């Protein structure tokens, strides 16, 4: 029996789901402004998909193409799910404007598109999703859990592609990554009693994910309480394909 390629293994791990329009539950006051900014960062979801699509037109390994094409569909699903939640949560005009300016900065950055996708997913999305898990309502925690499962596969795929092609992020892309995460968590405090409301906790996590590819401080995410079914209105439960 032939061993499956890592790209095939990642593809086999996927589980389709469909976003639904949620109802917003109780949100911690201290986290509300940052959640608003993090939701504005959803404008990066479709560009990340476009980065992958553009990469497919270049020198991406042939055996990665099926997985990457499917990953683009995931990004469209994530954009829809977060858009539904943002509509229910309420958007801030200034946050939306800044989110789109950051989106444009990522689009216009000259690094390879797969590199940009990897950095955005590993060092931005991998920070925002745990933030939603620790500070969001039941609906937002559920959305973040489903997106997180997809993003683990995306980061695995993009890491393999970058390794095969010898791609590394430039210092200017790292600077853009820092500017992005710093803007999102700016409303949080410093040296707070609750570390999940501490700005430095989240910026440090982004740095470690960027430079080390891991953030041990997120080990609690695996044990973070997931919403029980009885906590939800049925409209908050994703639909499976």
What are these regions (language model features)?
Residues 1-241:
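Non-heme di-metal
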């Amino acid at each position: 029996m032939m061993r499956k390629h890592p790209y095939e293994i990642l593809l086999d791990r996927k589980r389709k789901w469909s976003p639904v329009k949620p109802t917003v539950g109780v949100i911690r006051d201290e986290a509300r402004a940052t959640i608003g900014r993090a939701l504005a960062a959803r404008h990066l979801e479709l560009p990340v998909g476009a980065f992958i699509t553009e990469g497919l037109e270049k020198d991406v390994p042939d055996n990665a193409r099926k997985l990457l094409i499917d990953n683009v569909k995931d990004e469209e699903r994530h954009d829809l799910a977060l858009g539904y939640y943002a509509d229910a949560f309420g958007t801030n005009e200034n946050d939306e404007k800044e989110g789109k300016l950051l989106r444009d900065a990522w689009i216009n950055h000259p690094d390879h598109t797969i590199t940009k996708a990897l950095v955005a997913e590993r060092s931005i999305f991998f920070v925002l999703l745990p933030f939603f898990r620790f500070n969001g309502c039941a609906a937002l925690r559920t959305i973040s859990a489903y997106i997180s499962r997809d993003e683990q596969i995306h980061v695995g795929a993009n890491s393999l592609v970058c390794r095969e092609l010898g791609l590394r992020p430039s210092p200017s892309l790292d600077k853009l990554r820092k500017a992005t995460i710093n803007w999102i968590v700016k409303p949080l405090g410093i040296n707070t009693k609750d570390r999940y409301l501490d700005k430095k906790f989240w910026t440090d996590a982004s740095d470690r994910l960027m430079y080390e590819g891991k953030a041990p401080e997120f080990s609690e995410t695996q044990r973070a309480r997931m919403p029980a079914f009885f906590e939800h209105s049925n409209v908050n439960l994703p639909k499976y394909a």
